[in-house]
Amino acid sequence: MTTAAIIVAAGRGTRAGGDLPKQWQPLAGRPVLAHTLAAFRAAAGVSRTLLVIHPDDRARAEALPGVAEGKVELVEGGASRDASVRNALEALAGAGIERVLIHDGARPLVAPGLIARTLAALESAPGAAPAVPVSDALWRGEGGRVVGTQDRTGLFRAQTPQAFRYEAILAAHRAHPGGAADDVEVARAAGLEVAIVEGCEDNLKVTYPGDFARAERLLALAAGL
């Protein structure tokens, strides 16, 4: 089956600190996005890779490995995350794509096995996404004080890549009014079932300064350093 990967990297997040959005900050000597793209370019069965960028980042994006050679296609993002994903989905229309992976550009440590088992879950459902069960105690707070606890039974921390049958998620995005937190929300609004796939604690989203140090340690371990 023909599969495309959409890497969403049009955000301007600043919680990581620094002068650049987190996906463009250096990680082990390369931009975060370079690691993310390498994972999908190496993934079995992915025939096209689309990188969704902010218009201001085009020069940076053109310098990434794979872009100049045409192995990574650039798509300009929209005013929101779901609009950015929709732009990429529309760019694939009519290309014979059957499955699509949608991934946060700021998750550079996605493993080949996670990509493979997420795609495999599409055999039994129109959507699939990795997640990790919540294991910590959960509190409700107000005014800086704990005011209650929350049962964590059945709660998961969502990850990406989120995989879908292409035509189903394209139709779901076209029908959605916008404002979704992720593509699972868009899919469920359209009545699509989404299978939960076993996620990975190391598949972190670099969001805060400390995340970069952790990601560098994990990369060093993976390289045997």
From Swiss-Prot:
| Species of provenance | Cereibacter sphaeroides (strain KD131 / KCTC 12085)
The chemistry this enzyme catalyses reads:
2-C-methyl-D-erythritol 4-phosphate + CTP + H(+) = 4-CDP-2-C-methyl-D-erythritol + diphosphate
DNA-binding as a keyword? no
Q: Which residues form a coiled coil?
A: none
- Tell me which Gene Ontology terms the entry assigns under biological process: isopentenyl diphosphate biosynthetic process, methylerythritol 4-phosphate pathway
This protein's record includes keyword Transferase = yes
Q: Sorted alphabetically, which Gene3D superfamilies does this protein's record hold?
A: Spore Coat Polysaccharide Biosynthesis Protein SpsA, Chain A
The disulfide bridges present are none
Job of this protein: Catalyzes the formation of 4-diphosphocytidyl-2-C-methyl-D-erythritol from CTP and 2-C-methyl-D-erythritol 4-phosphate (MEP).
Q: Which family does it belong to?
A: Belongs to the IspD/TarI cytidylyltransferase family. IspD subfamily.
- Identify the EC number(s): 2.7.7.60
Entry's SUPFAM superfamilies?
A: Nucleotide-diphospho-sugar transferases
An example Gene Ontology molecular-function term? 2-C-methyl-D-erythritol 4-phosphate cytidylyltransferase activity
Return the protein name: 2-C-methyl-D-erythritol 4-phosphate cytidylyltransferase
Specify the enzyme's EC class, one word: transferase
Instruction: Please name the InterPro entries in this protein's record.
Output: IspD, IspD/TarI, IspD/TarI_cytidylyltransf_bact, ISPD_synthase_CS, Nucleotide-diphossugar_trans
Gene field: ispD
Q: Which HAMAP family match?
A: IspD
Keywords of the record = Isoprene biosynthesis, Nucleotidyltransferase, Transferase
